[in-house]
């Protein structure tokens, strides 16, 4: 969303600082009748709409929806990196309170919170007559949704945060104590989302694509309850979204990760980026300044795209993810398939050395890469499907989807499983996602195997086969946690939060490290050309340090940035 009027909002802060630094006489002598102040700005619907656009623009920050998410992608079980890349500190769990991204995300989320707070606070005293129809309530509802979204990200990245529900103007108001996730939920997130749910439309017209909707607020509220293990409330909200028939799965899963067919029927909350606006500006630049306009672009593709095609591949699919996608078995009876060997889900997610079709407009056999233990590259969020190389200056116009319908279906399956052990219903909703991917459903596996299905997260390369397990609440939950959410939603910002809330990070790291040890020991047999992973030259050690270093108290959440600790009197006393 275009970053408009950010300079106006920054003037408010500047004016406040100037006022506190001048004597009363000087201030009275040097009034500027043309100056924009809170008393003159926060009046009309147009002014509030402009300020709301600035709050939306905070979604484009690279740590929120763009290239800096690479650091979070490598935290869990779906990805690794190389030792010379910056994400390695997150892969090895050696990050600290002063490192990039830990500080960037904190700062950028609070910028978003500040901008939303401005709209929420000042609209309370705005005259109703200045607004048309329901626009006043809709503007407040959008701002409250955004504030809730930013606080959800803050709470589940840092384990809590400082609650700012008003625009701070004094040192005392800036220095707040650290509040828990529960406190943030009850004080900010849940009330804001309930208000948003009750006051937002189901859909907007084409001119307003990207604005928060009833479905976004309801889905995020359900997610809040899911994370809080309030299973019944979560299930009820997800089912309301499902039954609304506003959303559906796209026929082609790749429509969710490319610049074509954006804001489609599967999209519930999506952040808009553009390649064409502000050409020449680096994609990492978000806000307008006195020197240049914000890029409106994402730097994500430069991070995840392949090194030989103008990117850096700082995020690499883990062998575990690669192997699960290899065995994401195509259902030849599903009409979505057309003699393809790879599942639609695999083809839109990763690029193995033996991939199908074209990759950056050339056959895989002509492309370079896949050496030094790099068995696959990330396709999702990159421009592999329509360009010969990633654009210069970190620019990509691919939107980022924070909430999509497939996620809601899987969260609903989890909620009913945990609430009532109803694994039959859970399987039905998991299979909706699997069917769209064109792969064999759990139900079909069960029909063919006497009520059992394979544990696809267990490495067939390492352990010889996928064990068959009878369907029951626990085995279906394990499949949902280790397989379905991992491969359907990988590189979308959910995985580490999932592993943390389930409490299985240590178990997963230990298992995947053991698989690495086996591959190291048996490396002489894992030569180029051998299925399923075609690993060349070495085994990449993604999980040796993670398994060794992981501590829930140290790594489940990022530390409070050192700068906040040093300046916040309520933290350093």
Describe each region flagged by the PLM:
Residues 45-53, 57-63, 84-158, 174-186, ...:
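Conserved, well-structured interaction surfaces
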Residues 66-84, 164-166, 200-220, 226-296, ...:
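Short, surface-exposed recognition loops and adjoining beta-strand edges that mediate ligand/DNA contacts
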């Amino acid at each position: 969303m275009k970053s408009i009027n950010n300079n106006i909002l920054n003037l408010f802060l500047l004016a406040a600082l100037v006022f506190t630094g001048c004597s009363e006489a000087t201030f009275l002598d040097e009034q500027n009748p043309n100056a924009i102040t809170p008393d003159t700005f926060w009046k009309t619907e147009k002014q509030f709409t402009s300020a709301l656009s600035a709050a939306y623009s905070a979604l484009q920050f690279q740590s929120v929806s763009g290239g800096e998410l690479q650091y979070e992608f490598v935290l869990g079980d779906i990805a690794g990196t190389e030792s010379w890349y910056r994400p390695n500190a997150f892969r090895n769990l050696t990050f600290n309170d002063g490192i990039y991204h830990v500080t960037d995300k904190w700062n950028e989320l609070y910028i978003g919170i500040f901008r939303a707070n401005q709209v929420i606070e000042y609209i309370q005293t705005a005259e109703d007559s200045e607004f048309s129809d329901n626009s006043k309530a809709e503007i407040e509802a959008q701002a409250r949704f955004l504030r809730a979204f930013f606080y959800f990200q803050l709470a589940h990245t840092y384990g809590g945060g400082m609650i700012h529900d008003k625009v701070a103007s004094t040192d005392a108001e800036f220095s707040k104590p650290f509040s828990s996730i529960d406190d943030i939920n009850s004080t900010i997130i849940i009330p804001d989302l309930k208000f948003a749910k009750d006051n937002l439309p189901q859909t907007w017209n084409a001119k307003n694509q990207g604005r928060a909707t009833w479905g976004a607020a309801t889905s995020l509220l359900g997610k809040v309850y899911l994370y809080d293990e309030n299973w019944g409330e979560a299930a009820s909200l997800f089912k309301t979204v499902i039954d609304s028939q506003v959303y559906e799965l796209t026929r082609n899963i790749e429509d969710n990760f490319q610049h074509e067919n954006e804001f489609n029927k599967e999209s519930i909350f999506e952040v808009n980026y553009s390649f064409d606006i502000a050409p020449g500006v680096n994609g990492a630049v978000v806000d307008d300044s006195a020197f240049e306009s914000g890029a409106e672009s994402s730097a994500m593709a430069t991070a995840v795209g392949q090194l030989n095609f103008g990117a850096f591949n700082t995020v690499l699919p883990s062998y575990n993810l690669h192997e699960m996608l290899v065995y994401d078995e195509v259902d030849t009876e599903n009409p979505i398939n057309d003699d393809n060997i790879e599942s639609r889900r695999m083809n839109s997610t990763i690029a193995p050395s033996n991939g199908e079709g074209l990759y950056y407009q050339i056959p895989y056999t002509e492309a370079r890469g896949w050496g030094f233990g790099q068995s696959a590259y990330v396709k999702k969020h990159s421009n592999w499907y329509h360009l010969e190389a990633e654009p210069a200056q970190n620019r990509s116009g691919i939107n980022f989807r924070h909430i999509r319908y497939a996620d809601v279906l899987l969260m609903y399956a989890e909620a009913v499983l945990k609430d009532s052990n109803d694994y039959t219903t859970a399987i039905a909703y998991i299979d909706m996602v699997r069917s769209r991917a064109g792969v064999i459903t759990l139900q079909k596996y069960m029909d063919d195997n006497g009520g059992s299905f394979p544990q696809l997260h267990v490495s067939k390369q390492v352990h010889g086969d996928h064990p068959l397990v009878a369907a029951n609440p626990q085995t279906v939950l394990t499949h949902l946690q280790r397989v379905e959410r991992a491969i359907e939603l990988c590189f979308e910002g959910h995985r580490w939060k999932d592993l943390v809330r389930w409490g299985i990070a240590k178990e997963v790291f230990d298992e995947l490290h053991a698989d690495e040890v086996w591959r190291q020991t048996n490396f002489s047999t894992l030569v180029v050309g051998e299925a399923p992973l075609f690993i060349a030259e070495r085994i990449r050690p993604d999980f040796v340090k993670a398994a060794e270093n992981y501590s829930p108290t140290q790594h489940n959440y990022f530390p409070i940035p050192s700068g906040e600790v040093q300046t916040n009197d309520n933290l350093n006393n």
